[in-house]
Each structure stands twice: as C-alpha cells, then as structure tokens.
Curated annotation (Swiss-Prot):
It comes from Pongo abelii. The gene is PPP1R1C. InterPro entries: PPP1R1A/B/C (IPR008466). May increase cell susceptibility to TNF-induced apoptosis. Residues 55-75 have a biased composition (Polar residues). GO terms for biological process: cell division; intracellular signal transduction. This is Protein phosphatase 1 regulatory subunit 1C. It is found in: Cytoplasm.
Amino acid sequence: MEPNSPKKIQFAVPVFQSQIAPEAAEQIRKRRPTPASLVILNEHNPPEIDDKRVPNTQGELQNASPKQRKQSVYTPPTIKGVKHLKGQNESAFPEEEEGTNEREEQRDH
C-alpha cells in the first residue's frame, strides 16, 4: 500500500462453520428429495400404492410437476358478455362514453 493512499479497513472474516454437524447435514440432504427424484418416484409407483394415496393438499399441489397439476384453460369473454358488462357499468366509464360519442359525431360529418 502506498504511504499517501487512504487507509483501507480490513475485516477479519472467520471461516464459515455450519451450526449443525456435517453428519447431520448429510442426513438431511439425503432425506430431502429433489424435484427430479420426485418425478422419477411418481412415474415408477406401483398401482396398489396409488390406490391408497390420500388426496393432495394445497401445499402438495404447488410442489407437483406441471403434468400432475390440473391444466386450466383460458376462456376469453364473449362479445355478448362484454356488452352486458358494459351496459351495467355505463356510468362507471364516463370518459370512455365521451370518446365513443365524439367518434360517432366525426363519422356523421
């Protein structure tokens, strides 16, 4: 370090030590399944195990693979439904109505 340069603070960083024993950490790692192993296990389940299975809870559904989740299909609103909603909310969008009235007047000219 040069004599005229500002002094830099150096911190002594202790070596990271896990709060649990390495053996315990290894046991936890072995017990905890990875997403890939879950998919492999689910593909190779014998049928009799599937019959005894309890319905999934909400938490289990979030962890399920995309194939196992119920696929929802987007249904766009119909023209009839949009017109019905717009008819109900006409007072809710006054600026939108003004814009349509102005466009209609321009078409008439």
